Amino acid sequence: MTRESVNHCMNDPWWLISKGMSESLNEELKKELSQQHILYGKEAIAVARREDNDDVIFWIEKMNKYAVVHLTYTKETTSEYPITSLYSQRELEEYCKSVSKRY
């Protein structure tokens, strides 16, 4: 899956990110995850983010899912943070559209 897979559902407040920003957000996620977190040890590729908060959409190939992660910019010690929701592509499209309608 690539950024192009979700491009058609990226309306405000969502926006696709550059490769450089993706790499930076991928590293930030790694810093934040505790060993108990559902994404720990899995390759995550940032594809989009919200302009009004710290939510980032990551593609998790090993799970064949997208993860919407609310980054905290802090090293976390529990499985609860950063808050993460997993979606299939169809579910992610619905979620992003619902956020855009409320935005």
What are these regions (language model features)?
Residues T2-K42:
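Negatively charged, low-complexity tracts enriched in Asp/Glu with abundant Ser/Thr
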Residues N11-W14, S18-M21, D52, E93, ...:
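Generic ordered-secondary-structure signal
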Residues W14, L33, K62-Y73, V99-Y103:
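Aromatic-enriched hydrophobic runs in primary sequence
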Residues I38-I83:
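Amphipathic protein-protein interaction modules
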Residues H70-Y103:
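A short, surface-exposed interaction/processing loop segment used at functional sites
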